[in-house]
């Protein structure tokens, strides 16, 4: 299972929100580029970025920072937040971003996801943020009546790279992932599922690996890393050991 550290951008800073509440902001680093490099140096195989300004207002004020991060890192980067047009998606890919995450637009303009996935196979990720099983949009400010599973089924034939399933009620709380919700998502998804929200301990990561065979192949971690609940190296090691235990014996796995 791949562990993906997160950087949330707000007004040029690296921050974290609690349950998507813009009034509950903790600033962790005023230099997101150095933070991104730190995660890479500590062993991250991919970086997850959320442009909170763009998610809330529909346009970005963080492009200079995003470009600098893309230029500075050698690992692939995925980014979400306010990507609601093909122009914006292409712009980010041109910056050197590996995958773009479509959230609000997936609900409001499903054709956009299908067209982008066809034009850029395996470069488009479906980001579904939900609370109590219903999809939220526009930076989690608006709540829809659409069930998560129903939205996923709409894109069963689209060439998307993955689905990021974020449980808003657990995001930033460190109270553990919503395994029930993730199980439901994995059951209806044809694409790999990446879990997001609630990770607060190494035990939470271990519990999440029970869903790997069901299709949950990655996990995004933010606050737990910033609050030093565990280190990135520790988390990667734990997940690697579990992966090795699940494999048949192979002498090459022994360092």
UniProtKB/Swiss-Prot annotation:
The keyword Amino-acid biosynthesis applies. InterPro entries: Aldolase_TIM, His_biosynth, HisA_bact_arch, Isoase_HisA-like, Isoase_HisA-like_bact, RibuloseP-bd_barrel. The active site is at residues 8, 129. Keywords: Amino-acid biosynthesis, Cytoplasm, Histidine biosynthesis, Isomerase. It is found in: Cytoplasm. Pathway: Amino-acid biosynthesis; L-histidine biosynthesis; L-histidine from 5-phospho-alpha-D-ribose 1-diphosphate: step 4/9. It catalyses: 1-(5-phospho-beta-D-ribosyl)-5-[(5-phospho-beta-D-ribosylamino)methylideneamino]imidazole-4-carboxamide = 5-[(5-phospho-1-deoxy-D-ribulos-1-ylimino)methylamino]-1-(5-phospho-beta-D-ribosyl)imidazole-4-carboxamide. One of its GO terms (molecular function) is 1-(5-phosphoribosyl)-5-[(5-phosphoribosylamino)methylideneamino]imidazole-4-carboxamide isomerase activity. The keyword tRNA-binding does not apply. SUPFAM superfamilies: Ribulose-phoshate binding barrel. One of its GO terms (cellular component) is cytoplasm. Disulfide bonds: none annotated. HAMAP family: HisA. This is 1-(5-phosphoribosyl)-5-[(5-phosphoribosylamino)methylideneamino] imidazole-4-carboxamide isomerase. It comes from Prochlorococcus marinus (strain MIT 9211).
């Amino acid at each position: 299972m791949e562990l993906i550290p997160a950087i949330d951008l707000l007004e040029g800073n690296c921050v974290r929100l609690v349950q998507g509440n813009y009034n509950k902001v903790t600033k962790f680093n005023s230099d997101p580029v150095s933070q991104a490099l730190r995660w890479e140096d500590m062993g991250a195989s991919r970086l997850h970025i959320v442009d909170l300004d763009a998610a809330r207002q529909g346009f970005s004020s963080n492009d200079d920072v995003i470009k600098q991060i893309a230029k500075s890192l050698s690992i692939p980067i995925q980014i979400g937040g306010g990507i609601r047009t093909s122009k914006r998606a292409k712009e980010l890919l041109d910056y050197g971003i590996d995958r773009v995450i479509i959230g609000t637009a997936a609900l409001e303009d499903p054709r956009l996801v299908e067209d982008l996935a066809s034009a850029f196979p395996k470069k488009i990720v479906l980001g579904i943020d939900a609370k109590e099983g219903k999809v939220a949009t526009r930076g989690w400010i608006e709540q829809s009546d659409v069930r998560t599973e129903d939205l996923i089924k709409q894109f069963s034939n689209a060439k998307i790279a993955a689905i990021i399933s974020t449980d808003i009620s657990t995001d930033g709380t460190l109270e553990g992932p919503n395994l029930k919700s993730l199980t439901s998502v994995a059951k209806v998804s044809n694409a790999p599922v990446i879990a997001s929200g609630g990770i607060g301990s190494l035990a939470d990561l271990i519990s999440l690996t029970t869903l790997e065979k069901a299709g949950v192949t990655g996990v995004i971690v933010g606050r737990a890393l910033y609050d030093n609940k565990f280190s990135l190296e520790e988390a990667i090691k734990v997940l690697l050991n579990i992966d090795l235990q699940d494999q048949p014996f192979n002498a090459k796995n022994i360092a």
